[in-house]
Curated annotation (Swiss-Prot):
Its cofactor is Mg(2+); Mn(2+). The gene is COP. This is Sesquiterpene synthase Cop. It comes from the Eukaryota. A motif (DDXXD motif) lies at residues 308-312. Mg(2+) 1 binds at residues 308, 312. Mg(2+) 3 binds at residues 453, 461. Belongs to the terpene synthase family. Tpsa subfamily. The keyword Lyase applies.
Amino acid sequence: MATYLQASSGPCSTIVPEITRRSANYHPNIWGDQFLKYNSFDLSKTDANTKEHFRQLKEEVKKMLVDAGPNQQLNLIDDIQRLGVAYQFEAEIDAALQRMNVIFQGNDDDLHTISLRFRLLRQHGYNVSSDVFRKFMDNNGKFKECLISDLRGVLSLYEATHFRVHGEDILEDALEFTTSHLERLKSHLKNPLAAQVIRALKCPIHKGLNRLEAKHYISIYQQEDDSHNKVLLNFAKLDFNLLQKMHQGELSHITRWWKELNFAKKLPFARDRVVECYFWILGVYFEPQYLIARRFLTKIIAMASVADDIYDVYGTLEELVILTDAIERWDMGALDQIPECMRVYHRALLDVYTEMEEEMAKTGRPSYRVHYAKEAYKELVRQYLAEAKWFQEDYDPTLEEYLPVALISGGYKMLATHSFVGMGDLATKEAFDWVSNNPLIVKASSVICRLSDDMVGHEVEHERGDVASAVECYMKQYGVTKQEVYIEFQKQISNAWKDMNQECLHPTTVTMPLLTVIFNMTRVINLLYDEEDGYTNSNTRTKDFITSVLIDPVQI
């Protein structure tokens, strides 16, 4: 375990001499002041020529979408969604899919068309039957081998299988069938199809982040010289770049706020990851109307990240009890017995919520929203404290003890509650009551978050001397190997995705935009915790993701 002796002076000094503090040796901020150079960008104040060009392109795309025949419309909707501009045509897409759901037959259509229609309808909450795929099976209940000659259809079927729910054996068989054939054939294909297959096997459409997938699909789409729609392509490029400028301006504001807090100096043991936090929340919602929501949620996840390090790495149990009590009471009193750096953190935390309360008052939103958010944050730090007690008392919890705590300390119930605060009239009091009661979709998201995090991070955390993860708990309790645990956890993650899919089928308890936000949070985890802890170790794959979405524009 790496440790150091905290000196008796400076921002993190305490009244207790020579307390041994742990250090996780996180790498420093890799971005510096890079994002401070960007100016605030208001889309409504785009120059007149660009605004008119954008309007004309949008009207042309809308006309094509409305006038298209059924199958052409299917493919156009798919392209619009994958190019990241579906938010511009929500009413038209909803109307088209509603008509398709009413007349969904599919008996005479090919594999690609049926698979695509199924995927788009499921994606928008329509509970269409997976029995439509039985026509592609032989008398033995297996998918016909002749289908592999239709690679486009096989790829479309593969993408459709990721919308399966519990009990859909036909889609389980379809996933196995398509995956095996695509894996076998991928090295023999030419671009752009090869790139699509490789991308799909790594990250199916259903699990991808909007901005990353849009940037990638723009590059794929423009390679399809014979089939791509130049108007749609130009519109998607312009839309991406305009949104990127807006996002750069937002990140500049966030970076300036973070720099003024000066946590890098005042809390040097904590991860300095505010850019990564913004990227995380950009994956939750990217649309212009959610600017305030992004700003608030980015600040909250940044504060939660620092709290995680205070509880995991820095604080003594006595200090953490005092800090937790102060957060529970939500006041600045009785903090003299903890280090100055914790007091700095606590003041900054309260300021974030005060800022949000002022924003709610300014926009005429009810104040109860921030109350729900505060309660969710209190619940989070209670679980941080429970884990800190396990560590400092050298206690190895059972899996049954670990999971109820760890599913909350993973932060996704807290984030789900906070994500609603800035979402306007969509987030009713009933919606806050619903999310606060930890519904199935939030539980499933938390399972994916916790198990993914533990699988990629448990070895480093074990070396650091942290409390046992779900991996160690399972290995010890059931006497199995690490690889066997991974297999079991992947099954649980797969089942959690099915739970989430089920919760998004009509009729839903809350509106689809609120469910989509929770789904998007899970998509971020799927990306960042795929091969490693891409948040903590952000100087590899995550750096490339952020560069692609927030620095490099699309070439017009």
